[in-house]
């Protein structure tokens, strides 16, 4: 992905 932000184990916010 273009930008990936991890906020915890198994949690990911992907901004395309």
From Swiss-Prot:
Keyword Membrane carried by entry: yes
Claim: Membrane is one of the keywords in the record: yes
Compartments, record wording: Cell membrane
Swiss-Prot/TrEMBL keywords: Adaptive immunity, Cell membrane, Immunity, Membrane, Receptor, T cell receptor
Domain of life: Eukaryota
Disulfide bonds: none
A GO BP annotation: adaptive immune response
Annotated Gene Ontology cellular component terms: T cell receptor complex
Quaternary structure, from the entry: Alpha-beta TR is a heterodimer composed of an alpha and beta chain; disulfide-linked. The alpha-beta TR is associated with the transmembrane signaling CD3 coreceptor proteins to form the TR-CD3 (TcR or TCR). The assembly of alpha-beta TR heterodimers with CD3 occurs in the endoplasmic reticulum where a single alpha-beta TR heterodimer associates with one CD3D-CD3E heterodimer, one CD3G-CD3E heterodimer and one CD247 homodimer forming a stable octameric structure. CD3D-CD3E and CD3G-CD3E heterodimers preferentially associate with TR alpha and TR beta chains, respectively.
Function: J region of the variable domain of T cell receptor (TR) beta chain that participates in the antigen recognition. Alpha-beta T cell receptors are antigen specific receptors which are essential to the immune response and are present on the cell surface of T lymphocytes. Recognize peptide-major histocompatibility (MH) (pMH) complexes that are displayed by antigen presenting cells (APC), a prerequisite for efficient T cell adaptive immunity against pathogens.
Name by which UniProt lists this protein: T cell receptor beta joining 2-1
């Amino acid at each position: 992905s273009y930008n990936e932000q991890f906020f915890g184990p198994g949690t990911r916010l992907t901004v395309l």
